[in-house]
Amino acid sequence: GLTFAAEAGTQRLRDVINKNVTWEQIERGCRIAFSEGYTSVKLYFMMGLPTETMEDIKGIADTAQQVVDLFYQIPDRPKGKGVQVTISVACFVPKPDTPFQFCAQDRREALQEKQKYLLSCVHSRKIKVNYHDSATSVLEGVFAKGDRRLGKVIETAFENGAFFDTWEEYFNYDRWMDAFAACGIDPDFYNYRTIALDEVTPWAHLDVGVSHAHLVREYQKALQAQTTPPCNRQCSACGANKLIGGPCFDYHQDLL
C-alpha cells in the first residue's frame, strides 16, 4: 500500500507544526491510489504534539474513516475487494535545533490515555491502529535534550543488562529508571518541562546554521497556528545561508 503522512488529525494542528498538507490533498492522493487499484493505505500521524487536544486525537480516527468512505464512493475502485486503512501513530519527541525544542514532552501516562482514546474512536473493522510504545518515546525525549551527565546513566543501564533496547523483547523501562535513580538524576528535568526561550541549552554551543532567533520566531508562530511558507517561496531568514555564502534559492524560479 501507500503511506500518506498527514501528521495530525486536524488542520489546526497541522498548521501548528507547519505541515502544509490539507485534507483535500490527502483525499486527492487516496482517490488516485484507489482508482489505480490500491486497496490499502497507511496514514501516518504523531501524538503528543504541542497544543494538542482530544479533539485532534479524534480527528485521526475521523480522517481514517473519511478515507474508508472515500473508497466506496469511487466508481472505478477495485471490485470484489475491501479497503484497509492502517493508522500508524508515533509519539512526538521534541528535538534540539527545532522550534519545538522549548516544549515539554507529553508524560507517558498522557500518551497512554490518548492511545486508548484513539482506539475508542475507531468503529470500523476496516481501520487498523498501530502506535509506538510510549516508554521508549519517553527515553528518547530524555536523551534527545540531555547533557553529558546522562553518559553515566547509559553506562549504568548497560552494566545492569540494557542492550539491543530498540528490540521490544529486550527493552526494560524499569531498568532505565533504576539507572537514573542510581546516578541521582531526575529524567523529568530533561523532557517534562518547558525550556525558557533564553535558557542556555546543552546544545547551544553547536552551530547548525539555523539561528536561535529563528527557532524562537517559529515557535511563537506555531503557538498561534501561523504557518511559514517553503524556503523556495519566501525566505524566512533562518540563517542557514551563512553556511553556503549566498542565497539558498533563486526566488525567481519555482522549484518542483
Residues of each region from the PLM?
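Flexible helix-coil linker/hinge segments at domain or subdomain boundaries
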Residues: 72-78, 117-133
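Generic recognition of flexible, low-complexity loop/linker segments
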Residues: 29-32, 72-77, 118, 140-142, ...
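Radical SAM enzyme core and accessory elements
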Residues: 123-256
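Conserved non-cysteine loop/helix-boundary elements of the Radical SAM core domain that shape
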Residues: 1-79, 98-112
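Structured core elements
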Residues: 1-5, 40-44, 86-89, 130, ...
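Core structural elements
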Residues: 83-93, 241
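Short, conserved secondary-structure transition motifs
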Residues: 89-99, 135-143
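Short, well-ordered coil/turn segments that N-cap beta-strands
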Residues: 37-39, 81-85, 125-127
